[in-house]
Amino acid sequence: MDGQRYTFPTEKTYLSWFSDFSRVRTISDAELSGIQLAMKNVTMRPGTQLVKITTNPQVFAVTAGGVLHWVQGNEAFAASLYGSNWARRVVDVPDSFFTNFSIGAPITTAVHPDGTLVTYAGSADRFVVVGGQLRRVTDAGFSANMFQSGN
């Protein structure tokens, strides 16, 4: 990327990007200290989970660059976007890490934000939202982008 060291603040954040820890490489303390620490932590992977902080009930979708979009409305509205099991996708982010995100426009219509992975009941097809449009993701593209079915 840019030669800097980025910190995953929580295991759940890491697992939104990778399915396991098999790609983590152990390096010496000397090597580690030679890599500049980035000024921000890694945020939840866009389109994979919904987030909230423990002290506020608002639920947010995450888009590129760690931008949060409040999913405005009631539970039925959230279900229309993310399915009946939408609450299982909500990850509590510790308040101290909430500053890693920035706030964008709220989601007020049943339109998925860019970067969201979408599947439909009864279909094996997978889509990603790009420029407001659904784009089918092939198996090769799914694997190459390290998408995960569980997210």
Regions found by a protein language model. Name each.
Residues M1-N151:
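Short, surface-exposed polybasic-aromatic patches that bind anionic ligands, especially phosphate groups
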